[in-house]
């Protein structure tokens, strides 16, 4: 908690605090994220509350630490990439944060994509009016989204055998640009790891017989 409080004081309030754990891809589902913390004491209380929530879920969850970020205003979007077994690498874009699964407002393209493809993806989601200043909301910098999509496509195309899945969720977008708030990457097993796993599987089947 002391380190989180110190970093928060250096960043400036308000801040966001979230748990860092390889076992928790969706931290907000268990109370692993606290927003709009106005002081060091609030950070300390949030830190203790997050730890309690994580331990209540399971004592086996690995906690690597905590992440302190400046509280920013904007619209949450998701950028992702995965490998379809039939079509290969696919890039995904849509409304992000907690609304991804609830609204299912996403579009996808096969990788690699052009900048024009990225522009089309941004325009095609049902929530596109939110990005254009809908009902008094500030118009966001859509060029920053297009750039992020293009760079993600380039990254996945460069390492198709190493990246199994990559999610940037949420990425916060406002009039000034875009900031990746949280991200998760799953790496493909190396050939040696796959062979070792296959040998273990064959051995366990043999022992079972």
Label every model-predicted segment.
Residues 1-209:
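ATP-dependent carboxylate/acyl-activation modules
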